[in-house]
């Protein structure tokens, strides 16, 4: 048990040393693979659209239940 505690302490100290030196650890190396491709494209998250509202263009934000709420009418 004493050896396991020392080994754990050594690993923690080495991790802190490498982190302070700026050497990337395994979690930093995998950061590029963890990103969602939809996060890079902001148009995917744009829920606003222009709708013809009786000849007047209006901006609507649609819910999942297809109920629209008028946000801004020109």
Swiss-Prot record:
One GO cellular component term noted in the UniProt record for this chain: extracellular region
S-S pairs: 53-63, 58-68, 62-73
Subcellular locations according to the entry: Secreted
Secretion signal span: 1-22
Molecular function (Gene Ontology), one example: toxin activity
Name of the protein this chain belongs to: Conotoxin Vc7.2
Organism: Conus victoriae (Queen Victoria cone)
Lineage: Eukaryota, Metazoa, Spiralia, Lophotrochozoa, Mollusca
Expression sites by tissue: Expressed by the venom duct.
Chief site of localization: secreted
């Amino acid at each position: 048990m004493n050896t396991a505690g020392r080994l754990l302490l050594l690993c923690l100290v080495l991790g802190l040393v490498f982190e302070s030196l700026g050497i990337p650890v395994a979690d930093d190396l995998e950061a590029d693979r963890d990103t969602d491709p939809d996060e890079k494209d902001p148009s995917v998250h744009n829920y606003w659209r222009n709708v013809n509202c009786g000849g007047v263009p209006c901006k609507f934000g649609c819910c999942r239940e297809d109920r629209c709420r008028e946000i801004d009418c020109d």
